Amino acid sequence: YPDYLDKRLATTRRTMQCIKRDVRPGGSSFSHLVGNGIEMYSRANYLEIEKPHRIVYTQEFCDKDEKISRHPLAPTWPERMLTEVTLSPEGTEQTRVTIKWECHGDTKPEELAAFVKARGGMTQGWTGSFDKLEEYLAETP
């Protein structure tokens, strides 16, 4: 299961290794991402989980010791993001995935501007992850 997530959740042209995973309200995960000559760490703090329909978590970049840091290529990137993933049935064979991703906490104007400017890249990242998931599901009986 962890290997599956590592391979499917990493964005295109990146690899991910989950160092720690405790997916439950109040739990957290800590991951190492490498790709395109960049190495970074991130942490997710799980706030709400409604199986199998919804998960809400905050996300932040960290150093290897889990101390909050900034995105290595975007020093004005918001310190913390709030992510909500909702799964809704679409007929009997499909599921609609809705992602709501926003700045969380005390966000400075320049951080919000960096977030808005990067929207296209974020869409590409989420799409790459879902493309990997779709490939996996097509291979699975």
Briefly describe each language-model feature range.
Residues 8-9, 59-61, 130, 137:
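Short, flexible helix/strand-to-coil boundary loops that buttress conserved ligand/catalytic motifs
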Residues 18, 134-141:
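Short, highly charged C-terminal tails/helix-capping segments
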Residues 67-124:
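Beta-strand/loop substructures that line and gate deep hydrophobic ligand-binding cavities in soluble
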Residues 1-16, 132:
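Hydrophobic ligand-binding cavity/cleft-lining segments
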Residues 13-14, 39, 78-80:
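Short solvent-exposed loop/turn micro-motifs enriched in small/polar/acidic residues
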Residues 16-70:
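Glycine-rich portal/gate segments that line the openings of hydrophobic small-molecule binding cavities
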Residues 4, 27-28, 52-54, 84, ...:
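Structural motif
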